[in-house]
Amino acid sequence: SQQLTPIIAQLQNSLCNALDTEFIKVDTLYPKLGVLQIHVNGQVYLIDGQLDLSAVWQALFNAKQNVFHACGEDIDLMYHYAGQRPLSNVFDTQVAMAFLGYGRQVSYQSALEQVLHVQVEKDQTRSDWLARPLSEQQERYAAIDVFYLQDLAQHLITDLKQHHFYDFVLEDCHHYCVDVAQQLPIEDIYLEMANHRYSSRQLMQLKQLAMWRENLAIELNQPRSFILKNHVIQQLLERTPKTMQQLVSDYQIKPAIVRHHGKQILQLLNKLPEPSQYPTRLPRPYRYRLEHTKDHIEAKIAQVSQELAIPADILMRKKWLSQLTTWVAQDTQNIDQLENYLRGWRYECLTLPLIDIIRQDLATTVFSVSR
């Protein structure tokens, strides 16, 4: 930990830190950190993930700016190890490239080729990062992952500022870090798999199964799919088994899971509370009921995209549009309940015009929601 002291001091005083992580997440729910890579003040550091990095995490949370490329898994890992969330100082070069028209999910390798005209190999992606010592190839690969990252960021920031997009990108990066930090209450986990086609009874079965699976995954530190895959849960809801024999023969469930937890799975599916305790059936998503308004919505998005020179798929996502439509239909009026992305810089130029379009359509449409 004494060797980390000068690195921590640099992180605290630097204007920008380039970061990446190498980890293993094959048979566990939580990632196992192998290496934390940091490029600060012209120096690249490869830090052993098995060390106590509490002070490093704190320094990164307090830093002026942390640069990542495709930060999702990295910051999720940081949240887990640091025990705090969310980060509020992230600049993601992948997000920046999307704003500048390179595409939404440009790889680091492709980003370096397109922006810096540098070619790097990605031959250690599936390497064992928990092995000690690391091979020379692993060390070189890990170092390269952050060596060019600050230069890439600076080139992109220059372009973003010329287009007046820089603040937009910082805002979207912040919203993304908040999204990754969100943790659903365990009793609401089932909503990630629920849809409007499920009956209230099926939603109750799903809720009980999802809570049980989540608790067991945490207890065993195993991926949820190792216990029950999502498509198997769907099959269990569609054709509810009554016996252990049916559970063994009709579904692709691991024998060990059936052996140790089969009876409990059957109970969760068949022993339900009173119907009054069932979850309310989900309404059909409003976006499916607005087919005749779809052209107007797409035209407005295309218009704003052209005016701002920002790709349409960056301006609006299906998830946000669905949430916006629901918000308008429920006549909520509370802007704070809108998706974060729909507020901020998008609000005046896109969200408000779309609200008017959707509201006009809903005024002439009668919805019925069945339970």
Model-derived segments and their meaning:
Residues 65, 69-165, 173-181:
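Internal, well-ordered alpha/beta segment that forms a basic, Gly-enriched binding/recognition surface
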Residues 26-31, 99-100, 132-135, 236, ...:
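Short, solvent-exposed polar/charged micro-motifs at secondary-structure junctions
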